[in-house]
Amino acid sequence: MELVIKDVPSLLSVSEIIFGRDFNEALIHQVVVAYSASTRQGTRAQKSRADVSGSGRKPWRQKGTGRARAGSFRSPIWRSGGVTFASKPQSHSQKINKKMYRGALKSIFSELIRQKRLIIFEKFSLDLPKTNLLVKKLKEIKLNNVLILTKEIENNLFLASRNLYSVDVKDVCSMDPVSLIAFEHIIITVAALKKVEEMLS
């Protein structure tokens, strides 16, 4: 299949097997959920009755006081006692094998091409790391909510985009399924697209 290059009047030939896949919503959903779960810190922690500091002595004898029986100062029903079902640090990561991950990326790129959300440039860079230069460049092509993918990180582009909420710059090795779905348009250079094709083949 052939794709149009925006800044140069020519076509780029790419693999139909990689960029002509059907939209597999279930697979993409599974991969996106797994990716999002793996970014969770999972470091929250609370103290159970075993972790709270305090005496292990029985507060008062079992019978004869007229008060409700009590066995510990650290009981969850007492003030300053432990939490009943205390949270502990845990990993939320889910296993996704390489074949599934690559399949999801192929499906996402194929859908981006079908929806004309993938815009290819021969070269996309800035002479200076200035935010207003990037804003002006994006206004010229009438785009605002954009992920810019390059073969290797363009320092000027990266620095210019840091203050823009709706623009992100990544190199191909750092791309992820969540970012590819989240942005309205993806700007990608020819070199980056060839690298994506090589990675997914």
From Swiss-Prot:
<keyword id="KW-0689">Ribosomal protein</keyword>
<comment type="subunit">
    <text>Part of the 50S ribosomal subunit.</text>
</comment>
<comment type="function">
    <text>Forms part of the polypeptide exit tunnel.</text>
</comment>
<comment type="function">
    <text>One of the primary rRNA binding proteins, this protein initially binds near the 5'-end of the 23S rRNA. It is important during the early stages of 50S assembly. It makes multiple contacts with different domains of the 23S rRNA in the assembled 50S subunit and ribosome.</text>
</comment>
<dbReference type="GO" id="GO:0003735">
    <property type="term" value="F:structural constituent of ribosome"/>
</dbReference>
<dbReference type="GO" id="GO:1990904">
    <property type="term" value="C:ribonucleoprotein complex"/>
</dbReference>
<dbReference type="InterPro" id="IPR023574">
    <property type="entry name" value="Ribosomal_uL4_dom_sf"/>
</dbReference>
<comment type="similarity">
    <text>Belongs to the universal ribosomal protein uL4 family.</text>
</comment>
<dbReference type="GO" id="GO:0019843">
    <property type="term" value="F:rRNA binding"/>
</dbReference>
<keyword id="KW-0699">rRNA-binding</keyword>
<keyword id="KW-0694">RNA-binding</keyword>
<dbReference type="InterPro" id="IPR002136">
    <property type="entry name" value="Ribosomal_uL4"/>
</dbReference>
<protein>
    <recommendedName>
        <fullName>Large ribosomal subunit protein uL4</fullName>
    </recommendedName>
</protein>
<dbReference type="GO" id="GO:0006412">
    <property type="term" value="P:translation"/>
</dbReference>
<feature type="region of interest" description="Disordered">
    <location>
        <begin position="44"/>
        <end position="68"/>
    </location>
</feature>
<dbReference type="Pfam" id="PF00573">
    <property type="entry name" value="Ribosomal_L4"/>
</dbReference>
<dbReference type="InterPro" id="IPR013005">
    <property type="entry name" value="Ribosomal_uL4-like"/>
</dbReference>
<keyword id="KW-0687">Ribonucleoprotein</keyword>
<dbReference type="GO" id="GO:0005840">
    <property type="term" value="C:ribosome"/>
</dbReference>
